[in-house]
Amino acid sequence: MAAVPGGARALWWPPWLLLLLLGGPRGADGYFPEERWSPESPLQAPRVLIALLARNAAPALPATLGALERLRHPRERTALWVATDHNTDNTSAILREWLVAVKGLYHSVEWRPAEEPSSYPDEEGPKHWSDSRYEHVMKLRQAALKSARDMWADYIMFVDSDNLITNPDTLSLLIAENKTVVAPMLDSRAAYSNFWCGMTSQGYYKRTPAYIPIRRRDRRGCFAVPMVHSTFLIDLRKAASRNLAFYPPHPDYTWSFDDIIVFAFSCKQAEVQMYVCNKEVYGFLPVPLRAHSSLQDEAESFMHVQLEVMVKHPPVQLSQFISAPSKTADKMGFDEVFMINLKRRRDRRERMLQALHEQEIDCRLVEAVDGKAMNTSQVEALGIQMLPGYRDPYHGRPLTKGELGCFLSHYNIWKEVVERGLQKSLVFEDDLRFEIFFKRRLMSLMRDVEREGLDWDLIYVGRKRMQVEHPEKAVPRVRNLVEADYSYWTLAYVISLQGARKLLGAKPLAKMLPVDEFLPVMFDKHPVSEYKTHFSPRNLRAFSVEPLLIYPTHYTGDDGYVSDTETSVVWNNEQVKTDWDRAKSQKMREQQALSREAKNSDVLQSPLDSAARDEL
């Protein structure tokens, strides 16, 4: 045995003892039975009560309830509090069907239906907020708050019946913010959202420079604001939450009798700061309608929210526990509705077909000509020649194969219109978004056109107005229609049999230019006179809807922007790429702002144009 300093003898330790002392099991896995214990379990998910108030909400409920089902919070830790009253539709039946189906999945369900009466005595219509309606809603919210407190819920989340919570993590994300009152910023088709950045001394909305940067997410985070509404979370664990109330109004309250303002005042008096978070896309809500609006307006407004969701997100999934209403598609009074789509653009095709389905529009899917797949021999076999002297106005390049394919796609539809003798047809491309009340507004316009006996060949439904120096001429006695000046884009248009014959009669394949340059030539509004000399007569009777009913889904520079026409190759030389303009394309930039003098202010307006309230 080796010697050690000081003459001490080295001790020999058995290996099993070293293992026990230095590296053996310990703690929860103690060596002796009495030393073992189980690790601590994680905390349970907080208890949340979700409060839903619904009135005449039948069109929205399948989607709204489906979104609530997909919230990633344990259902056994979630209670439902649902109230409905003053209905003229089947809101009560839908909610009852849903609650019966899900009551075994959630911690508890409280159901407060009232079948009668169907209206308030002081209301002017179903969308009018009278004092008695405000008071009733405040009492219901207070009842939900009391139920949450009585069951010792940690949180209560209020959700309006037409708010779509598309982000399933919304609830957990709001809880993580650790705020007494916090709302997820909801998106809409306009600047409207579920928060205010400013409030006057009388409690009314006040415009502030802070609002738009938050609404557009130029600034991201959670922001202190004087008002949140529609969908928001209250942390009932916070001591200050005990002083919050929806009803009755605070004794010092003298502002307008409005449920959201009353609650904002309650928060102010309790020294509870409201917050809105815009870190992610949480969901969507409709822009409020005017008091005179109908339930049909409301149903179509919510359907438009679903269309807007689909522009950049998957379609809204409906509840799996209730039967979805059936839809009956039609052609809107047209002989045919065409929808052009490249076979390789499956995502666009599926989105457009779903959007048309939601609006109950029947269409014939037309496979677009893929110019990029055409070789020189195929082009020559069709007798295609480029218009002498044509150059793209922004880049000086010739026609691209993508533009060639786009032209042929429309050209083939014009041929079909003539061959089938279709008197009036509607043509859609696949990269567009619909304005609110699209179907009803276009059908109303076409009735006006027919009533007045207007001689027309083509009507733009979506376009980019290029002549911005002076207004276009309004059409007398026809609402929402102007005589079209120089325009870009063929997003959507109505074409007559006579118009299709005129376009084919111009023999455009032998002197081709982009289709949205060809059309202005044919109605004699193209600014380049040299192009017009190759076509005669130029007597296409072209008009445009005003305001427009169709816009692009994406503009140059937007996330997800893809062009199959500009990012291609030159039509007769596959070696010359045109992909340089993907980020700088002027053609697909958003319509520039028009001066007051250039706006089409003389056009007759439809009542549907003003159905929605001011966006803020």
Protein language model features and the residues they cover:
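Short, acidic, metal-binding catalytic loop of nucleotide-sugar glycosyltransferases
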Residues: 42-45, 64-77, 87, 97-103, ...
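Acidic donor-binding/catalytic loop of UDP-sugar-dependent glycosyltransferases
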Residues: 62, 90, 138, 142, ...
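Conserved short acidic donor-positioning loop in nucleotide-sugar-dependent glycosyltransferases
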Residues: 68, 85-87, 161, 343, ...
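A conserved hydrophobic helix/loop-capping motif in glycosyltransferases and polysaccharide synthases
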Residues: 48-57, 64, 71, 83-85, ...
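An acidic/histidine-cluster motif and surrounding catalytic segment
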Residues: 187, 231, 251-252, 261, ...
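Short, flexible, basic/aromatic active-site loop/helix in glycosyltransferases
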Residues: 184-188, 199-225, 229-241, 466-485, ...
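Active-site-proximal specificity loops/subdomain of glycosyltransferases
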Residues: 90-154, 361-422
